[in-house]
């Protein structure tokens, strides 16, 4: 979920968190996943407007049987670059007649690839980073690979878990929490790998998910009760149970030591176990998008424009850059 730039309607939890009696400062410092809590304190020191409830990142889902049929192994997926993935994907199209790769989220495709060069899609101060050489370069790459049939976009399928389940695409990049929508009927083995990145660029893997907030328009007693509920909901056992039953990642490191998580990781047939291991490793490259006004609207624009450009509806890269920048600017300025 996208955080809004407007936070005054939610309570600053710092006074509770730092309290000697009921606080959880040490837990947040030592046990919560740092990148999950950073997102909720991005407004400055001693300004914490919520705590993470569930978080996901993105992973690469691969049809292992088809991959091997093409002459590759899962070793080829280690530290995978888009350049290598394009080679594999073109072979999938040429030999199997299916696309080799797609992004489940076209907005994440643009935002994460832009972040590989250290740029935020829209900065907290409202600066839009679409008009640059890196955006032009990777968008032209994705267009070329989509036009050749190696890559594809979601389109009318809405999500790529459907085509993947039906073996109509070799691999896709999607949420670590989306595996429940994959139904392969045991017809093929699923491999899970870290998402690809461009050669020579930084890895950038988005983190998303729900957080818990307390509103300002309730009594002090109600706010404190809500804070105690947040503590309860995010304790080690509860974050482990909630995460493993929904496919999300626990928000505490200590969850890995619970029987709930241990049992799943020990189960070699568990797809969640494969995802957990990859996603947990990916967190060292995780980032979050800055909280901006009308964030979801801006995402919708880049989603639509990305797909229009790579599919060929928008034919010129400068038209894509200029139109997208203009529409995003209008969107984030709208009150």
Range-by-range predicted roles:
Residues 144, 184-253:
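Extracytoplasmic/periplasmic substrate-recognition and gating elements
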Residues 270-327:
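C-terminal capping/gating helix-and-loop segments adjacent to ligand/active sites or protein-protein/ligand interfaces
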């Amino acid at each position: 979920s996208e955080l809004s730039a407007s936070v005054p309607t939610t309570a600053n939890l710092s006074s509770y968190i730092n309290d000697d009696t009921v606080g959880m400062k040490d837990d947040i410092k030592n046990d919560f996943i740092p990148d999950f809590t950073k997102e909720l304190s991005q407004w400055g020191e001693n300004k914490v407007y919520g705590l993470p409830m569930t978080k996901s990142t993105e992973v690469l889902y691969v049809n292992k049987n088809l991959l091997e049929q093409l002459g590759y192994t899962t070793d080829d997926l280690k530290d995978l670059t888009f350049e290598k993935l394009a080679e594999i994907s073109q072979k999938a199209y040429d030999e199997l007649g299916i696309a080799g790769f797609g992004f489940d989220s076209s907005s994440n495709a643009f935002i994460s690839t832009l972040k590989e060069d250290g740029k935020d899609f829209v900065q907290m101060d409202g600066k839009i980073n679409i008009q640059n050489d890196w955006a032009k370069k990777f968008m032209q790459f994705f267009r070329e690979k989509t036009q050749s049939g190696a890559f594809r976009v979601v389109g009318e399928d809405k999500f790529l878990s459907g085509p993947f389940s039906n073996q109509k695409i070799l691999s896709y990049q999607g949420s670590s929490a989306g595996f429940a929508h994959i139904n392969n009927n045991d017809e093929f083995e699923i491999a899970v790998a870290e998402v690809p990145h461009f050669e020579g660029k930084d890895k950038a893997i988005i983190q998303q998910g729900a957080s818990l907030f307390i509103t300002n328009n309730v009594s002090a007693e109600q706010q404190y009760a809500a804070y105690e509920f947040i503590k309860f909901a995010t304790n080690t056992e509860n974050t482990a149970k909630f995460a493993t039953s929904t496919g999300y990642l626990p928000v505490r490191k200590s969850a890995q030591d619970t029987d709930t998580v241990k049992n799943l990781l020990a189960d070699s047939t568990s797809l969640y176990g494969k995802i957990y291991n990859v996603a947990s490793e990916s967190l060292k490259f995780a980032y979050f998008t800055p909280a901006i006004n009308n964030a979801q609207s801006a995402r919708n624009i880049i989603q639509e424009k990305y797909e229009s450009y790579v599919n060929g509806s928008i034919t010129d890269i400068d038209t894509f850059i200029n139109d997208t920048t203009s529409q995003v600017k209008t969107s984030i300025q709208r009150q």
